[in-house]
Amino acid sequence: MRKITVTLLLILLTFTIANSQKPVPRRQIAAQVKAEFLHAWRGYKKYAWGHDDLRPLSKTHHDWYAQPLLMTPVDALDTMVLMGLKNEAATTKRYIIDNLSFDKDIYVQNFEVTIRLLGGLLSAYQLTGDKRLLALAEDLGNRLQHVFNSPTGLPYRYVNLKTGKVRGQVSNPAETGTLLIEFGTLSKLTGKRVFYDKAKRALVETYNRRSPLGLVGTRINVETGAWTNTDSHISAEIDSYYEYLLKSWLLFGDADCMRMWLQSFAAINKYLADETKGTVPSELWYGHADMSTGRRTATTYGALDAFFPAVLALSGDLNRAKRLQASSMVMWMKHGVEPEEMDYRTGEVKSAGYPLRPEIVESTYYLYHYTKDP
């Protein structure tokens, strides 16, 4: 799930549309979104060009690691193409091709670099057709694939881009199982099966370590395959594992992913779904439970969980998708903006931050796409 400053405006526009009784001037709204994107992009270019991120308050730059990897330009290029910003896209593409190198003696987090840089380069290549972007993606994929060299096939968390050395043996399902879309796409575009096979094995090995109830935990040792935290949920550290089971089936037609998704989906709905109403009225939430016993361990739901209505809609379960989206809207409307996490039984906010999460926007899009209900 990738973030950019424009997320805030998208969210505001989304809920303006949802609550409006008048026809929505779509061209006007599209122009507003594009203008906000350009505002954010120009700020980045002015104060942080050549680095990973802009710190807007101090007007300084920030790099994720010891050396910059052009996170923002790579992340934003496909958005520029989709918005028809030809000049900005051409300038950004040229800068990436001329300046981005992965031959750096730095440790990077495989999960974050995969979803942002590898995914960004692949989508930019698919939209522009420039094979130099695919060459960069393949080079990155070759450097990242060392993470899969564990005794279990579950990936280590960190890899040195230059030496291939790895570290970080305690990981989580989101990081071990959220790789197949990017690595699989790299395989399809390069014709090199190794990327697909290694990422799929990591996904399968994560699934194979589910409990007899069909649930996975929060943290796992990639060298032993033993769980170090048995809390099960759809939130941070697990969330996109479930998303990639479904989307890998839909994207690649992989029958194993279909089987794993359907079994996991049944377990999620049996042990994590919660229809108990509390002080925050709603029909459906998804809470936490112990992966081995199914015992409820927490009744929290947050901004990261709000991806799940989109997954439910994509899976064909529009009934649950609409009910859970209504819960997400309750969480949003209670304070005018969603908290990072709240207790859905008491209404107590557990984490009040708001780091511009886009998950609820994606779910709103999918629900509207399938239902046409504003």
Where are these regions (language model features)?
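Generic cytosolic/nucleocytoplasmic N-terminal low-complexity/intrinsically disordered segments
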Residues: 2, 18-21
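Hydrophobic h-region of N-terminal signal peptides that target proteins for export
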Residues: 10-18
